[in-house]
């Protein structure tokens, strides 16, 4: 009776263990499906984040290269402008000065010759012809008028242009200063723009790293849950195997063995034969 109750109890425990095992298997399958879905959902954002990070890194590199190119071009333009302005100033002004000095020297020589001609008016005609020839040569060289003198020379077109060139030197320098200021402002604006862009990129990268850390923590949590479920399943498998072995051992003990059955059968046949022999002996005596 105790063995029967024990067998019933073990069978009930085995059935409960099987039900729990089926439930655990269903939960494990569901967790596996959720993990697959979760990995699929996480792989797409991860790839998107990787592509975004790569694109933004490429944009930052391109912006840095473009900034370097712009700065180099601006420096080249400024240097070229400065060299052109300085070369023009040093080329134009000395030419004007040399031309003015040469014209002043020629005028002084002409005045000296005229004075000498007036002083030596009583000289020979050869000196007069020489002076006329020199005067004609000067007039052909500098395009003098017939009535030109030292006072009207300063009102000539070349002289006016010379003074205008001198007066236009300061506006050229002012324009150069304005251009340098504009270039400086442009460089400052470009640097501020790149600083703001760099700050935005850093903020975006920080946000992406935070999202990646959150996703990793979620994946680790799901993995721990899955490992716990697997360990519980292994424990239930061990309990199920133990219950099966106990049920099998109790069933073997309750069922009689064939040898004992054969021995009992042989004993009963011997007893029957002895009884028959006794009855056969008793019958002749009675007769």
Curated annotation (Swiss-Prot):
Keyword Coiled coil: yes
Compositionally biased residues, Low complexity: 255-267
Keyword flag Coiled coil: yes
PROSITE patterns documented for this protein: IF_ROD_2 (PS51842)
Domain IF rod: 1-254
Annotated segments matching region Disordered: 248-287
Keywords: Coiled coil, Intermediate filament
Ranges of compositional bias, category Acidic residues: 271-287
A single cellular component GO annotation: intermediate filament
Family: Belongs to the intermediate filament family.
Protein name, UniProt field: Intermediate filament family orphan 2
Protein's organism: Rattus norvegicus
């Amino acid at each position: 009776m105790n063995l029967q109750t024990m067998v019933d109890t073990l069978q009930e425990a085995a059935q409960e263990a099987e039900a729990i095992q089926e439930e655990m298997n269903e939960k494990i399958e569901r967790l596996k499906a959720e993990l697959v879905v979760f990995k699929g959902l996480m792989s797409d954002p991860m790839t998107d984040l990787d592509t975004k990070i790569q694109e933004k890194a490429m944009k930052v590199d391109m912006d840095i290269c473009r900034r370097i190119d712009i700065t180099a071009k601006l420096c080249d333009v400024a240097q070229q402008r400065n060299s052109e302005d300085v070369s023009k100033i040093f080329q134009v002004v000395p030419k004007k000065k040399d031309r003015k000095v040469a014209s002043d020297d020629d005028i002084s020589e002409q005045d000296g010759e005229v004075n000498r001609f007036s002083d030596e008016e009583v000289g020979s005609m050869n000196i007069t012809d020489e002076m006329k020839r020199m005067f004609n040569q000067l007039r052909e060289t500098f395009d003098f008028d017939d009535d030109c003198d030292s006072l009207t020379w300063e009102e000539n077109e070349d002289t006016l242009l010379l003074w205008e060139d001198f007066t236009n030197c300061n506006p050229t320098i002012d324009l150069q200063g304005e251009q340098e200021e504009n270039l400086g402002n442009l460089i400052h604006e470009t640097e501020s723009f790149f600083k703001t862009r760099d700050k935005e990129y850093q903020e975006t990268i920080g946000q992406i790293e935070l999202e990646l850390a959150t996703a990793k923590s979620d994946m680790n949590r799901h993995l721990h849950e899955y490992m716990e479920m697997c360990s519980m399943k292994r424990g239930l498998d061990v309990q199920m195997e133990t219950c099966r072995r106990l049920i099998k051992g109790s069933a073997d003990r309750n069922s009689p063995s064939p040898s004992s059955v054969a021995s009992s059968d042989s004993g009963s046949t011997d007893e029957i034969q002895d009884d028959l022999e006794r009855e056969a002996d008793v019958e002749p005596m009675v007769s």
